[in-house]
């Protein structure tokens, strides 16, 4: 069960200094920063902006929707350490992604890329690419106001990227490489060679 965070709270630096730390925090907490509508998608990135003394704006005066973080307030939200970037192919793990209005979410959506864009996951149903994303209130079949989870989202409504330049964008973790030159491997190779055993 996720621990609920309500209001503007200051986190420990080790909860948001890297994407992996932020991800660990997010997956164990529900965030309702503004006290409106419980855990909205906007609340999670807004809490991150707050840690840097910034406000993630939807529109001047507030009370907007997620896609307005890009369409109306892109430049207001791209304050250091955040920069705005265009283009799906530029998505890196840890980037904050903004999506436009769709039949699934008329308010748009805002979340974090949990993998780099690779162009490998084609969704034939929606004729678009998919990407694993970390966010709140997302995914089919969930109840509204769900705390953070990771789901594959289609990128058809993608608008843009806010990148935290304080995070070193480490590549998406992949499987470990097997090293074949451990002493026991070398010994086994030598033993096979002496016995004329071929593998």
Description of each model-found segment:
Residues 1-62:
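N-terminal capping segments
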Residues 4-19, 27-29, 110-191:
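Aromatic- and glycine-rich peptidoglycan recognition patches
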Residues 61-140:
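...with weaker cross-activation on analogous glycine-rich loops/strands in unrelated enzymes
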Residues 39, 105, 177-178:
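A generic "functional-site adjacency" signal
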Residues 193, 197-199:
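Cysteine-nucleophile amide-bond enzymes
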Residues 40-43, 95, 189:
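Acidic side chains
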